[in-house]
Curated annotation (Swiss-Prot):
It comes from the Bacteria. Keywords: Cytoplasm, GTP-binding, Nucleotide-binding, Protein biosynthesis. Increases the formation of ribosomal termination complexes and stimulates activities of RF-1 and RF-2. It binds guanine nucleotides and has strong preference for UGA stop codons. It may interact directly with the ribosome. The stimulation of RF-1 and RF-2 is significantly reduced by GTP and GDP, but not by GMP. One of its GO terms (biological process) is regulation of translational termination. It comes from Streptococcus pyogenes serotype M6 (strain ATCC BAA-946 / MGAS10394). Its main location: cytoplasm. CDD domains: RF3, RF3_III. Belongs to the TRAFAC class translation factor GTPase superfamily. Classic translation factor GTPase family. PrfC subfamily. The lineage of its organism: Bacteria, Bacillati, Bacillota, Bacilli, Lactobacillales. PROSITE patterns: G_TR_1 (PS00301), G_TR_2 (PS51722). This is Peptide chain release factor 3. The keyword GTP-binding applies. It holds the Pfam family RF3_C.
Amino acid sequence: MSLTEEIKKRRTFAIISHPDAGKTTITEQLLYFGGEIREAGTVKGKKSGTFAKSDWMDIEKQRGISVTSSVMQFDYAGKRVNILDTPGHEDFSEDTYRTLMAVDAAVMVVDSAKGIEAQTKKLFEVVKHRNIPVFTFINKLDRDGREPLELLEELEEVLGIASYPMNWPIGMGRAFEGLYDLHNKRLELYKGDERFASIEDGDQLFANNPFYEQVKEDIELLQEAGNDFSEQAILDGDLTPVFFGSALTNFGVQTFLDTFLEFAPEPHGHKTTEGNVIDPLAKDFSGFVFKIQANMDPKHRDRIAFVRIVSGEFERGMGVNLTRTGKGAKLSNVTQFMAESRENVTNAVAGDIIGVYDTGTYQVGDTLTVGKNKFEFEPLPTFTPEIFMKVSPKNVMKQKSFHKGIEQLVQEGAIQLYKNYQTGEYMLGAVGQLQFEVFKHRMEGEYNAEVVMTPMGKKTVRWISEDDLDQRMSSSRNILAKDRFDQPVFLFENDFALRWFADKYPDVTLEEKM
């Protein structure tokens, strides 16, 4: 198979949702159809002993939530599928946002009882900003939920995107009978031995079912007043195809997967800082690091840099340019993933995600090129933390483990590090409380370094240039610090302290990140 044909086979997407909408469960079912697991491990608490394949970190297994993005790959129906299962918890939006820079499409999972929730809306806005296609899976039809028409209306109003139902539920909860498949023009049956039936058989099958008449009325209404189906509108991110189903009972998931792969886009190009778009079919290899993860194998204390291949082909042992440093690197020890399990890979192509063993060479956002190519891809989003804690080792004899743990976890981008300019104290910044809990858990579990964490409360953060730096500007209400890149930064007690500082030092430029 030619390189072009291989690249065109790739389908790389992220699954996004609000916590508990069933995102990890649907990921499990997709892996099941891809032949990667024998049974889908439903998400359960710590007593059951059954854990989701994509939730590999101890704290994820204990809590039943995803706090880091998993990467999984399988072959299905002539396509090579790369799934990125993202954290649903709002504290981990930074990791999720970066992950969304590495995909060509998104699958949005919605709880049929709750509709569009806060985190779903937040993540959708990022996807919309990138104009990537969104496919919607309305989940949990095995439970009682809201009316399908009401859910479609909310989706369009809240998210500002047109929708087109690919199927329609026949009943819900205990009265759930199946799906009226508009795209494949058939019925998918929830009960009984037969999986499918023709539309013509519907009247006989559901002769005594009051829901079926309502279904036919709803479909007639949608055909008269609903949006037209347009493959181009889907690819442009203007229309979301909507699928109903139940991930827990594995109903409607395979039909979704088949149809998704029919319409999901091939790998797309990425913009450089100079505004050029690198074509995925270009011969020369290029890619970018969108995530760094330490201790995927705690026994080996390893670090993996996740790279999205943008163009060309990776071959084991190839040399690359690291544009940020101007130095070269050799890609000899490279893996692909199934959550925590992995295998060495000798070649991969545009659209694929590879893991490069990292000894401290790479940073999130790094561009890799070959030959004379020295361009950089557009920077990944960074976020200003809102809450802070001082951190120190509980045992001074564990200083080495403490520093190694902090260095690796900060390089992952899971938490941000600041150092007090005058005292040298370490301060951690996060967008939510859960990040601190995960940091503490991982420091103790992965690095055997107990930590003392002292809350500092909320802070307003602004960066300044080295030229404007004057240590006399620091006070109890505005702490002068350095970030992990040694850039000077002020942590203001509140907005009032920020305004007071700006009035007192009008010539100092204060910079805000995202």
